[in-house]
Amino acid sequence: MRLHEYQAKQVFADAGIPTPASQLAETVDEAVDAAEEIGYPVAIKAQVHVGGRGKAGGIKLVESKEEAREAAEDIIGMDLKGYHVSKVLVEEAVDFVNELYVGVTMDRGEGRPVAMVSTKGGVNIEEVAEEDPDAIAREHIDPAFGMHPFQARKVVYEAGVDREVANDVASVLTTLYQLWDDRDGADTEINPLMITSDDEVIAADAVMNVDGDALFRQPEIAEMGEEAAEGDELEQKADEYGFDYVRLDGNVGIIGNGAGLVMTTLDLVDYYDGEPANFLDVGGGAKADRIANALDMVFSDENVDSVVFNIFGGITRGDEVANGINQALEQFDEIPKPVTVRLAGTNAEEGMEILNEDLVTVEHTLEDAVQRAVEYAKEVEA
């Protein structure tokens, strides 16, 4: 479960990490009043779970009351990559001389958490990791003992952080790890951690993903989660239907039964140069209505250009899946997005006979199904 920026910053601030002065606003007037109280210049930032908010018009720097009103009117109520913006964070603009990245996540290959620091902050850290992996210093942590101060200092110095602020950055990293551990974090990061001309460190952004299966022991975070889901109609719909759903940034919609099967499909979409739009696990024993709901939901994502079903029947029967797909598609005069289906396992042959091949493309192997779905998505892009 991912918290909004304003929620993550509150958690960070409560733990002692410096953050800019800010106020949450739900209306234009509230945003203007907040800007006046904080003092210009301020940043007005859409509170939605998407990357690249600035490039998409979801973050604006303003220097006057008139600019604040205009920016708030533009951002509040806008659709940002499929997310409805209902709240903005009005935040003090930080005058900085340098930007860093600091983060803690789980290295599943090593089976241990890893702390990361880079002097290439303020940009997409995934791109940095791909293009210049040596620009990110890493330190694995033994969860039995936690992060020692010397480890924090070591990774900060290895990243090339200036000595004048190295101890403060190490302190922030140590706190970030403690939050990751105490709050059952999946990812915690600050990008950018800004360095001012006075050698102060300030968390200008905040990301906190929490293990959803651990929310029973994180009541405060769970309460935040109800608010964090607001504004994303697809995630709300997934909760209503009882689907395990994660929205991604690509254009190939993915529906499967079982987390491992869906993850494999995501990996194959990426392998064949496609971009997954979502993770959607309908669960075991899915009936026709449930399959139809899943397809309707993925269709409603405007970023999706093609859909692939990957179903391996155990208690989920192929004929039920086929009936659900037909049920969902027969309501349309024209199929809005191409659908590719791969069925295997229980009643798979019956299911393939039931499927209306005028409405879907049937493939007999997962590789063929994924390649076809990626091709369809690329045809739409072209």
Curated annotation (Swiss-Prot):
<keyword id="KW-0067">ATP-binding</keyword>
<feature type="binding site">
    <location>
        <begin position="314"/>
        <end position="316"/>
    </location>
    <ligand>
        <name>substrate</name>
    </ligand>
</feature>
<keyword id="KW-0460">Magnesium</keyword>
<dbReference type="GO" id="GO:0004776">
    <property type="term" value="F:succinate-CoA ligase (GDP-forming) activity"/>
</dbReference>
<dbReference type="InterPro" id="IPR005809">
    <property type="entry name" value="Succ_CoA_ligase-like_bsu"/>
</dbReference>
<feature type="binding site">
    <location>
        <position position="91"/>
    </location>
    <ligand>
        <name>ATP</name>
    </ligand>
</feature>
<feature type="binding site">
    <location>
        <position position="99"/>
    </location>
    <ligand>
        <name>ATP</name>
    </ligand>
</feature>
<dbReference type="InterPro" id="IPR005811">
    <property type="entry name" value="SUCC_ACL_C"/>
</dbReference>
<feature type="domain" description="ATP-grasp">
    <location>
        <begin position="9"/>
        <end position="237"/>
    </location>
</feature>
<dbReference type="InterPro" id="IPR017866">
    <property type="entry name" value="Succ-CoA_synthase_bsu_CS"/>
</dbReference>
<dbReference type="GO" id="GO:0006099">
    <property type="term" value="P:tricarboxylic acid cycle"/>
</dbReference>
<comment type="similarity">
    <text>Belongs to the succinate/malate CoA ligase beta subunit family.</text>
</comment>
<dbReference type="GO" id="GO:0004775">
    <property type="term" value="F:succinate-CoA ligase (ADP-forming) activity"/>
</dbReference>
<keyword id="KW-0547">Nucleotide-binding</keyword>
<protein>
    <recommendedName>
        <fullName>Succinate--CoA ligase [ADP-forming] subunit beta</fullName>
        <ecNumber>6.2.1.5</ecNumber>
    </recommendedName>
</protein>
<keyword id="KW-0479">Metal-binding</keyword>
<dbReference type="InterPro" id="IPR016102">
    <property type="entry name" value="Succinyl-CoA_synth-like"/>
</dbReference>
<comment type="subunit">
    <text>Heterotetramer of two alpha and two beta subunits.</text>
</comment>
<keyword id="KW-0436">Ligase</keyword>
<feature type="binding site">
    <location>
        <position position="191"/>
    </location>
    <ligand>
        <name>Mg(2+)</name>
    </ligand>
</feature>
<dbReference type="GO" id="GO:0000287">
    <property type="term" value="F:magnesium ion binding"/>
</dbReference>
<comment type="pathway">
    <text>Carbohydrate metabolism; tricarboxylic acid cycle; succinate from succinyl-CoA (ligase route): step 1/1.</text>
</comment>
<feature type="binding site">
    <location>
        <begin position="52"/>
        <end position="54"/>
    </location>
    <ligand>
        <name>ATP</name>
    </ligand>
</feature>
<dbReference type="GO" id="GO:0006104">
    <property type="term" value="P:succinyl-CoA metabolic process"/>
</dbReference>
<keyword id="KW-0816">Tricarboxylic acid cycle</keyword>
<dbReference type="GO" id="GO:0042709">
    <property type="term" value="C:succinate-CoA ligase complex"/>
</dbReference>
<feature type="binding site">
    <location>
        <position position="257"/>
    </location>
    <ligand>
        <name>substrate</name>
    </ligand>
</feature>
<dbReference type="InterPro" id="IPR013815">
    <property type="entry name" value="ATP_grasp_subdomain_1"/>
</dbReference>
<feature type="binding site">
    <location>
        <position position="205"/>
    </location>
    <ligand>
        <name>Mg(2+)</name>
    </ligand>
</feature>
<feature type="binding site">
    <location>
        <position position="45"/>
    </location>
    <ligand>
        <name>ATP</name>
    </ligand>
</feature>
<dbReference type="Pfam" id="PF08442">
    <property type="entry name" value="ATP-grasp_2"/>
</dbReference>
<dbReference type="InterPro" id="IPR013650">
    <property type="entry name" value="ATP-grasp_succ-CoA_synth-type"/>
</dbReference>
<dbReference type="Pfam" id="PF00549">
    <property type="entry name" value="Ligase_CoA"/>
</dbReference>
<dbReference type="InterPro" id="IPR011761">
    <property type="entry name" value="ATP-grasp"/>
</dbReference>
<comment type="function">
    <text>Succinyl-CoA synthetase functions in the citric acid cycle (TCA), coupling the hydrolysis of succinyl-CoA to the synthesis of either ATP or GTP and thus represents the only step of substrate-level phosphorylation in the TCA. The beta subunit provides nucleotide specificity of the enzyme and binds the substrate succinate, while the binding sites for coenzyme A and phosphate are found in the alpha subunit.</text>
</comment>
<feature type="binding site">
    <location>
        <position position="94"/>
    </location>
    <ligand>
        <name>ATP</name>
    </ligand>
</feature>
<dbReference type="GO" id="GO:0005524">
    <property type="term" value="F:ATP binding"/>
</dbReference>
